[in-house]
Amino acid sequence: MTDNDYPFDMLSQLSRLSQMSGIEDIIIETQPQESISDLNMIDSEAASVASVTNDRTLMRRCIVTLFFNDTAENLADWALDPASYFNEPEKDIKEWVGQFELCPTTNHLHAHIHVHFARQMRFQFIRDQFSAVSQIKLGDIKKGRGTSKHAVQCAVNYCIDPRKRHPEEPFNEAYLWPGNKTKWEFDQACADKQTKKKPTKEQLVKDKIALVDSFPYHWTWDQIVHSSDEAKELFFGCSASERYHKTRAVVQARRVIESVEIHYGAGGTGKSTFARQLGTKLGETSGRDEKYTRNYDDGNFWGGGITKYAGEAVVHLEEFEGQETLSKFKDICELGASGPNVNVKNGGTTLNHSHVVITSNTHPAGFYKGVWKGDPKQFAPFWRRITKLVFYPAHLPDGSLNAPKCDEDVYSIDQTEEWKALQGNYEGCLKMAERDWALRDDDLDSNKRPFDDAFSEGFVLPRPRQMQRSATEHNLFQYARSGRDPTS
């Protein structure tokens, strides 16, 4: 008989069993397959079919799987007793344990028995002893592997595992032969050690991906690694998982820029508070603060590490006075479009915001005054991107200081309609600033470079600084410099 005489899935079951129970060779009844009426009765975990070995194979330990005819009666009284199969079990057998089980797929009754013979027995003799009982269908006989206590305990555990035992009487008790030389019992610690198998490479990859995906994409890699002991063990030194996490932002839904608001005026009047409240409100669904405050000290970088931009919905340009170039500003505030690509330390990212909040102590007319004074038409692209303008005066209408004591006590003036009426006219914006929040003189000239007037009439290059001798120069220095006696 060859491997092709049996279903392929039965062969795969063999591999699983041999790994689980510490059993080596599978030896089956050598009669033709058709003589076994129902191979589906075989337990999906226990029974397997493999090539037949030599009938003269010697074995001292084995696991026997038995099935029973439909006409078999009183199985609990005799089916697990070694005296039912051997004439002199006290001489032939050293240890014998087993139990009845139900196949989880077919619900057929069968039994697993672990046998330790007093001496080596040939396979043909063992097979004939079990086959001689007419009510028995011999499923298979598996040769034991190893003689250590752990190997034997694994085989015993497999045959008397209470999790697989038949749940109903009279089959719900494991059979431990009274003549056993060793009092074997089910060892839970050994079973736990056996079931904790090393995962395959494919399964390990799936576990890592699933664990990474369980964390918010905006978390830093350090936060993920130190979130739990499981994450530490799984991700320690795993650069592939780190690279995978860094690219998760790519699959996030892209936001469209909906609003650009400017809140300007006196300090301490609630401008930054508005930006914070907006970020908190939008973060109610995502579970985090959705406001990112631009740090101009980072230069062209939008942060790094835990301070980098991580997909927040609100970009806050705090204390803004034109620190971003006008071209970059227009990209950040392009209504109806998605955010541009920006640099972050050790990488890059894409802005994915929907709101821009600009807070400043300077009127918008002074943001890019150096550009607009030279080319007033450049003001129009800036003007049309602003959807709301709010002014925070230094004093209340009654003349008292505008110093809100709580978030609800903020006083501001909405100038959006007046802003829209400018129609991109920079001169009108300057007049508006002069009326409400005048620009400082240094604001008007701060963009002027040292040699802007180099070709104007009367321009003179500044003289370089000259070292001035101190009027109280020490006599020793005078002598060292001139060689003359300073006292004469």
From Swiss-Prot:
Source organism superkingdom: Viruses
GO molecular function ontology, one term from the record: RNA helicase activity
Keyword entries, A-Z: Host nucleus
A GO-annotated cellular component: host cell nucleus
InterPro entries, per database record: Helicase_SF3_ssDNA/RNA_vir, P-loop_NTPase
UniProt-annotated stretches for the region Disordered: 462-488
Disulphides: none
Gene3D superfamilies attached to this UniProt entry: 3.40.1310.20, P-loop containing nucleotide triphosphate hydrolases
Subcellular location: Host nucleus
Purpose of the protein: Plays an essential for the replication of viral DNA. Presumably cleaves viral genomic dsRNA replicative form to initiate rolling circle replication.
Protein name: Replication-associated protein
Native organism: Chaetoceros diatodnavirus 1 (Chaetoceros setoense DNA virus)
Source species taxonomy: Viruses, Monodnaviria, Shotokuvirae, Cressdnaviricota, Arfiviricetes
